[in-house]
Curated annotation (Swiss-Prot):
Role: Odorant receptor.
Protein name: Olfactory receptor 2M2
Species per Swiss-Prot/TrEMBL record: Homo sapiens (Human)
Pfam families noted in UniProt: 7tm_4
Record keywords: Cell membrane, Disulfide bond, G-protein coupled receptor, Glycoprotein, Membrane, Olfaction, Receptor, Sensory transduction, Transducer, Transmembrane, Transmembrane helix
Subcellular location: Cell membrane
Extracellular topological intervals: 1-25, 80-100, 159-195, 260-272
Signal sequence segment: none
Amino acid sequence: MAWENQTFNSDFILLGIFNHSPPHTFLFFLVLGIFLVAFMGNSVMVLLIYLDTQLHTPMYFLLSQLSLMDLMLICTTVPKMAFNYLSGSKSISMAGCVTQIFFYISLSGSECFLLAVMAYDRYIAICHPLRYTNLMNPKICGLMATFSWILGSTDGIIDAVATFSFSFCGSREIAHFFCEFPSLLILSCNDTSIFEEVIFICCIVMLVFPVAIIIASYARVILAVIHMGSGEGRCKAFTTCSSHLMVVGMYYGAALFMYIRPTSDHSPTQDKMVSVFYTILTPMLNPLIYSLRNKEVTRAFMKILGKGKSESELPHKLYVLLFAKFFFLISIFFYDVKILALIMYIA
């Protein structure tokens, strides 16, 4: 019972990845800059697709969902890391830790399934173009995206509930910059071997099964492209699919390396570096990859800048919504700082 009380009443200590030496301070602000670029890039991508009616297609709807997931993913981990670094505090409550685990696992899992849906969408568009409007109509596309969110959230709920069931009787220092599930397994007093097997199976479902769909889809796409008689058609198909393949390679490469290995093989330093790439760099690169290689997205962005034919109200809507998102981010970022200042004032 004492252990259970400790589980709910004590905070965890996030050791983080930066100290206050000049090199680490520079790296911290570099990561913070990457976070802001990722936040703005994914916000712009979501808003462009929402506001520009020419982008209201299944492919761009799925892309907007990917950007939304990336946006939520970086907001799950980086603001708390930044607050702890700037305030000098390293603690996080049990509820906060479970919340991070739930959103991190849910969003990561949802992205896995969504990337598989996006690969299937490209397969239908290239291999069955005449049936595309029937096989990928808005209703079917919406259902696939919804199931991606649901399946990812299911895994997040499993991990969050499991965290509450663990007892933590020893050290509460998490060798990471956020609450990640493998790091908590190491701290638990319970025998976690059975649960590690369950997590491994969940990872197989979340990672390997979507990868199989992606490989099967693009194998058919490659065969279809090879048999295309038009060089222009091949170039267009390659351009359409290459952006998605680059994102898949970055995302699944880091995820497979991170979660398929046994817990005993995890190195704290190695895990931190992979997590930085997985949670911050990839969300920053995704909108850049899709926008730089996509004429429709580039056209929509140029329309916003007023360098093309545009609807007069479009820029105004974008700026208002983007400002609202940025204000929301700042509110989240400084929420804990205000509480800290109030406590210090009272003391």
